[in-house]
Amino acid sequence: MTRVLKAKKRKAQSGETRSAVVFLHGYGANGADLMGLADPLADHLPDTMFVAPDAPERCGAGPFGFQWFPIPWIDGSSETESMDGMARAVADLNAFLDAIMIDHDLLPEQVALVGFSQGSMMALHVAPRRPDALAGVVAFSGRLLAPEQLPDEVATRPPILLIHGDQDDVVPVQSLPEAAEALEAAGFAEVFAHIMRGTGHGIAPDGLSVALAFLRDRCGF
């Protein structure tokens, strides 16, 4: 049985929802952490609803945040616990996305994922394995997990934008070209990348501007 994800929502500014951006937060954070990104985006995406779920588990490394799955080198969990946790979170997120589409009468091509760090890892894992292609994925400061499995498991190939800070000391910037190479090897025709100069493990204004352009031009929002 999947777990129901609690989420913050911001209605479409125009009053008519024609698309949705689902923010997926990083390890130890919560949905509210990324919902602030809706402020600079909403004026440019008036028909877009913004949704930011909390990950399904309390963070093992701290009492206040959430995690999509355990990270062994941070919280002392085992590799098996981490893999099992991710499998459960994938099912939870897929159920959440299905519910968003049903509740708001949206098609998969009207829904985009915007992730940060561990949330990006979830987005890059979930989107290609869904049977109907989502509008796109924006992955800030993440990595593609189990790239060797992707060619055999990919079901759809939505446009993907990878964004990373060149000073990231949490998830190395080399994760970006590694993900791009694996995606292209798996047949993804639309893989875009942007490096945020002088940026650590975070989201800089230039990265957000590129994400906005992607959502408008490639996702049709």
Regions found by a protein language model. Give the residues of each.
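Short, proline-enriched alpha-helix->beta-strand connector loops that line the catalytic pocket
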Residues: R18, E109, A155-I160, A189
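Primarily recognizes the serine-hydrolase "nucleophile elbow" in alpha/beta-hydrolase
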Residues: M101, E109-T156
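C-terminal catalytic histidine-bearing segment of alpha/beta-hydrolase fold enzymes
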Residues: P177-F221
